[in-house]
């Protein structure tokens, strides 16, 4: 029981394959309640897939994925729908509705899932926009926003229903240093102010480790390391060092496997 209380998400011995490719081989990880957890690893390792497993969008081949003590893969469709209201996902693209202004984008989940009277809905939306610094942009369309503003608008929508869990899929990708700093600050402040549990998938090592309470590194279908930022920086595992230090060649090779070089230089080879 204590395990369920301490960890909002608890993945136990989870395996998942896509076609003939094994993505995860018997992995286990936990997401402590009210903390910021980072998921890191090389491109194509399955980090976004892990978020989809937690959200119940796809099911594992075997293993348990507990959310607040309930096994997500075993839930009925109606129960999963109810539980998902306690989760929110910030997509890499932001995924704003292009035909709605910023206010209506943030109001959308409130209109879909609550019966708030119009004045209270208005106040709630404006408070969420104020939290991300976009109250003055409420009437703008997504096409009028910069990339960073669009991410912040999407974040305001993600917190509209005050979820227990927010999952961030590469929130810092393609952002300039100022916007990246703003997003790092917002994630940290929302975690502190609301007590919301955050899972952040990111390649941006310095930024995500600066706010993560705990981090997990995926490689070779497994969890290869986990711990605090300090513990990971001291980890000597070559796979960890290559990823954290950005080393070009190592366990993840620089060159794609190929045949004899001289033979390939000949025409018709």
UniProtKB/Swiss-Prot annotation:
Pfam families: ABC_tran (PF00005). It is found in: Cell inner membrane. One of its GO terms (molecular function) is ATP hydrolysis activity. ATP binds at residues 41-48. Its EC number is 7.6.2.-. The keyword Translocase applies. Disruption phenotype: Mutation leads to accumulation of phospholipid in the outer leaflet of the outer membrane and increased outer membrane permeability. It confers sensitivity to SDS-EDTA. GO terms for biological process: intermembrane phospholipid transfer; phospholipid transport. It is a peripheral membrane protein. The keyword Cell inner membrane applies. Disulfide bonds: none annotated. InterPro entries: AAA+_ATPase, ABC_transporter-like_ATP-bd, ABC_transporter-like_CS, P-loop_NTPase. Residues 9-245 form the ABC transporter domain. Keywords: ATP-binding, Cell inner membrane, Cell membrane, Membrane, Nucleotide-binding, Translocase, Transport. One of its GO terms (cellular component) is plasma membrane. Part of the ABC transporter complex MlaFEDB, which is involved in a phospholipid transport pathway that maintains lipid asymmetry in the outer membrane by retrograde trafficking of phospholipids from the outer membrane to the inner membrane. Responsible for energy coupling to the transport system. Belongs to the ABC transporter superfamily. MlaF family. The complex is composed of two ATP-binding proteins (MlaF), two transmembrane proteins (MlaE), two cytoplasmic solute-binding proteins (MlaB) and six periplasmic solute-binding proteins (MlaD). PANTHER family: INTERMEMBRANE PHOSPHOLIPID TRANSPORT SYSTEM ATP-BINDING PROTEIN MLAF, PROTEIN TRIGALACTOSYLDIACYLGLYCEROL 3, CHLOROPLASTIC. This is Intermembrane phospholipid transport system ATP-binding protein MlaF. It comes from Escherichia coli (strain K12). The lineage of its organism: Bacteria, Pseudomonadati, Pseudomonadota, Gammaproteobacteria, Enterobacterales.
